[in-house]
Amino acid sequence: EFRRVLFRSSAASLPIINRMGGDQAAWIKVTLIYSVVAIGLLLWGFFGTKERVNTQAAQEAEKLPASVRFGALIHNKYFLMILFASLFLAVYQTVNGTVATYYAQYILGNNEYYSVLNLAENIPQVVVIMILAPFIKKFGKRNLVLAGAILTMVAQLTLLAVPANPAFVAAVAAIRGIGKAPLFGCVFTMMADVVNYGHWKTGVRVQALIFSAATVGQKFGGGITGAIIGQLMDKSGFTGLAQEIPSAVAMVENLYIWGTVFAWAIII
């Protein structure tokens, strides 16, 4: 139910902004509305949720010195892998979320195509996540994530041949949704596997540190990527006006295509 609400709000955002004038004030108003709703939902979740599972191993780990817990974390090679996967997943989400609007406007010719691309990518993703279980049992989480990452990269590279056809770009977005579904569907269970592996290898269960570090990695990746995108757009001469100079349009196209390829190449 929440996913359907997310789809509808994402698809409706740009049309609503355009109907409200399409200027900075319209963006601020819509963002403010979403922010108020988000704060309310977060507070609801915080005050309405109670953790009922607390293993003895986790309790004992919390009593250990920080140096011991961080040592167990660093010596867990799979933690570093999942950390980088989480970080560059955030890189992809930032690139796609930031640049896709400009790609729709300056490459496809209408910024409302962003809503179409968003739906085209997210609907297949959710469908695939819902049916992942039997494939995980047969092929394993790692193999599915690798196959999905390769599929996403290959699909994105086809945009080099046909970058400005809305139907083709939407089809590529749908394939991206299928490709990224295994990682989105498995990332948190893979973190749990990392916790169990670390406990087996070191005798120290540091689940709080692992999940916290992965979350920090996501925030760091998204923040740094956003700053880099801003710098590159500025250097290209991007102004945000209805008409952009060729260098700015080329930067939008390159970021949209190669940013995704780069992120998923690192994940692999």
Regions inferred by a protein language model and the residue ranges of each:
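A late C-terminal transmembrane helix in Major Facilitator Superfamily
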Residues: 202-236
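Transmembrane alpha-helical segments of major facilitator superfamily
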Residues: 34, 116-125, 218, 263
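Structural signature of the two symmetry-related core transmembrane helices
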Residues: 143-158
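Residue-level signature of mid-helix packing/kink "hotspots" within the transmembrane helices
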Residues: 122-130, 181, 223
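Helix-loop junctions at membrane interfaces in 12-TM secondary transporters
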Residues: 160-173, 184
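Intracellular loop-helix junctions on the cytosolic face of multi-pass helical membrane proteins
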Residues: 1-101, 105-110, 255, 260-268
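Helix-to-loop junctions at the C-terminal end of transmembrane segments
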Residues: 17, 127-141
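Transmembrane alpha-helix termini and helix-breaking/packing motifs in multi-pass membrane transporters
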Residues: 8-25, 223-249
